[in-house]
Amino acid sequence: MNLARPFRRLVSCAFKSWLTVRSLLPKQKCQTFSKSGSQKGAQIERIFVINLDRAPSRWSNMQQELRRILDSSGDELLNLTDRHVAVDANEFLVDPSKDDDIDPFYTLGDQLFVEPQPLVFPTKFELNFPIRMSRAEIAVARSHINVWRQIVASNYAFALILEDDVWFHNRFSKNLDQAWDEV
């Protein structure tokens, strides 16, 4: 018997209830976001949400989240948001091969260079052992690269990329404004 499953359901139910109750709280205002052409200085002008076509409920949840936060002019962040269709790993007929954008092979050494783990002491052999990205990892990477290209082709000085499973902490606006001011 898997004892973790009942607790996962309980936690999931409690979390969904909490998200519903949050909708009764006042909307947050975040000065870090603004429409293009604003004269208020450097602000995030566009939000891109990566969402699979086969996951419309996740897009609906994101829309609800983005309605909870207001930009510097008092408009919902949803008005600054573009939905970007994610690359679906289920549509790959074969494992994708290396191309100009993505090399599906990496090593533990590559991973530890990007994300150091001080408690991991691998041997030299382990560091150079090739690891193949899963189809899902490749699809995620392609989705992000496609959004980056869209941002580069635009005139947005600053943009935010989100995946469709984000929820905003009740101190999101305050914390982001503070961090943005420090940058």
Regions found by a protein language model. Give the residues of each.
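An acidic/histidine-cluster motif and surrounding catalytic segment
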Residues: 3-162, 166-183
